[in-house]
Amino acid sequence: MLPRVALTTMSWMLLSSLMLLSQVQGEDAKEDVPTSRISCPKGSRAYGSYCYALFSVSKSWFDADLACQKRPSGHLVSVLSGSEASFVSSLIKSSGNSGQNVWIGLHDPTLGQEPNRGGWEWSNADVMNYFNWETNPSSVSGSHCGTLTRASGFLRWRENNCISELPYVCKFKA
């Protein structure tokens, strides 16, 4: 018979081996489980948990946002980070949009009355923590809706007259 110390050591080794084996098998099982991917309608692309679509039929800012609202939780796109800005830019460029600025969900419902241009917000009420103005918006221009500018590669924002008719990008749930 084995001495008591050897038996205790072997028991711990066996227990450790079984625990390691169960962890490794558990990791393998996790890899076999299919991951859920969002499925976007034809003509739109997924980024994060949203679908994005560029519409080349020009509309005013208000009509464009209403058109986006026909989709689940849809609005004109809110651009919340540099990586999202790059994604939206690539979406627009890949469409062949050849020369117009593009509406996004940025607007100033105070019509320039908020001090220091503080009235700008996203149409879907997302918090504005990311700013990428091409030039600071003017409170006297009469332009209270936001676009992505062609000159910036569709990365930077500029104010525009809301009744101008432009292509637009919608952001919505799949």
Swiss-Prot record:
<dbReference type="GO" id="GO:0090303">
    <property type="term" value="P:positive regulation of wound healing"/>
</dbReference>
<dbReference type="GO" id="GO:0010838">
    <property type="term" value="P:positive regulation of keratinocyte proliferation"/>
</dbReference>
<feature type="propeptide">
    <location>
        <begin position="27"/>
        <end position="37"/>
    </location>
</feature>
<keyword id="KW-0011">Acute phase</keyword>
<dbReference type="GO" id="GO:0070492">
    <property type="term" value="F:oligosaccharide binding"/>
</dbReference>
<comment type="function">
    <text>Acts as a hormone in response to different stimuli like anti-inflammatory signals, such as IL17A, or gut microbiome. Is secreted by different cell types to activate its receptor EXTL3 and induce cell specific signaling pathways. Induced by IL17A in keratinocytes, regulates keratinocyte proliferation and differentiation after skin injury. In parallel, inhibits skin inflammation through the inhibition of inflammatory cytokines such as IL6 and TNF. Induced by IL22 in lung epithelial cells, inhibits cytokine production and regulates allergic airway inflammation.</text>
</comment>
<dbReference type="GO" id="GO:0006953">
    <property type="term" value="P:acute-phase response"/>
</dbReference>
<dbReference type="GO" id="GO:0046872">
    <property type="term" value="F:metal ion binding"/>
</dbReference>
<dbReference type="GO" id="GO:0009617">
    <property type="term" value="P:response to bacterium"/>
</dbReference>
<dbReference type="GO" id="GO:0042834">
    <property type="term" value="F:peptidoglycan binding"/>
</dbReference>
<feature type="disulfide bond">
    <location>
        <begin position="145"/>
        <end position="162"/>
    </location>
</feature>
<keyword id="KW-0862">Zinc</keyword>
<dbReference type="GO" id="GO:0032496">
    <property type="term" value="P:response to lipopolysaccharide"/>
</dbReference>
<keyword id="KW-0430">Lectin</keyword>
<feature type="signal peptide">
    <location>
        <begin position="1"/>
        <end position="26"/>
    </location>
</feature>
<feature type="disulfide bond">
    <location>
        <begin position="68"/>
        <end position="170"/>
    </location>
</feature>
<dbReference type="GO" id="GO:0043434">
    <property type="term" value="P:response to peptide hormone"/>
</dbReference>
<feature type="disulfide bond">
    <location>
        <begin position="40"/>
        <end position="51"/>
    </location>
</feature>
<feature type="domain" description="C-type lectin">
    <location>
        <begin position="47"/>
        <end position="171"/>
    </location>
</feature>
<dbReference type="GO" id="GO:0005179">
    <property type="term" value="F:hormone activity"/>
</dbReference>
<keyword id="KW-0395">Inflammatory response</keyword>
<dbReference type="GO" id="GO:0008284">
    <property type="term" value="P:positive regulation of cell population proliferation"/>
</dbReference>
<dbReference type="InterPro" id="IPR001304">
    <property type="entry name" value="C-type_lectin-like"/>
</dbReference>
<dbReference type="GO" id="GO:0050728">
    <property type="term" value="P:negative regulation of inflammatory response"/>
</dbReference>
<dbReference type="GO" id="GO:0050830">
    <property type="term" value="P:defense response to Gram-positive bacterium"/>
</dbReference>
<keyword id="KW-0479">Metal-binding</keyword>
<feature type="binding site">
    <location>
        <position position="144"/>
    </location>
    <ligand>
        <name>Zn(2+)</name>
    </ligand>
</feature>
<dbReference type="GO" id="GO:0002755">
    <property type="term" value="P:MyD88-dependent toll-like receptor signaling pathway"/>
</dbReference>
<dbReference type="GO" id="GO:0045617">
    <property type="term" value="P:negative regulation of keratinocyte differentiation"/>
</dbReference>
<dbReference type="InterPro" id="IPR016187">
    <property type="entry name" value="CTDL_fold"/>
</dbReference>
<feature type="binding site">
    <location>
        <position position="107"/>
    </location>
    <ligand>
        <name>Zn(2+)</name>
    </ligand>
</feature>
<dbReference type="GO" id="GO:0009609">
    <property type="term" value="P:response to symbiotic bacterium"/>
</dbReference>
<keyword id="KW-0964">Secreted</keyword>
<feature type="binding site">
    <location>
        <position position="121"/>
    </location>
    <ligand>
        <name>Zn(2+)</name>
    </ligand>
</feature>
<dbReference type="GO" id="GO:0061844">
    <property type="term" value="P:antimicrobial humoral immune response mediated by antimicrobial peptide"/>
</dbReference>
<dbReference type="GO" id="GO:0038023">
    <property type="term" value="F:signaling receptor activity"/>
</dbReference>
<comment type="function">
    <text>Bactericidal C-type lectin which acts exclusively against Gram-positive bacteria and mediates bacterial killing by binding to surface-exposed carbohydrate moieties of peptidoglycan. Restricts bacterial colonization of the intestinal epithelial surface and consequently limits activation of adaptive immune responses by the microbiota.</text>
</comment>
<dbReference type="GO" id="GO:2000972">
    <property type="term" value="P:positive regulation of detection of glucose"/>
</dbReference>
<dbReference type="Pfam" id="PF00059">
    <property type="entry name" value="Lectin_C"/>
</dbReference>
<dbReference type="GO" id="GO:0106015">
    <property type="term" value="P:negative regulation of inflammatory response to wounding"/>
</dbReference>
<feature type="region of interest" description="Sufficient to activate EXTL3">
    <location>
        <begin position="103"/>
        <end position="118"/>
    </location>
</feature>
<keyword id="KW-0929">Antimicrobial</keyword>
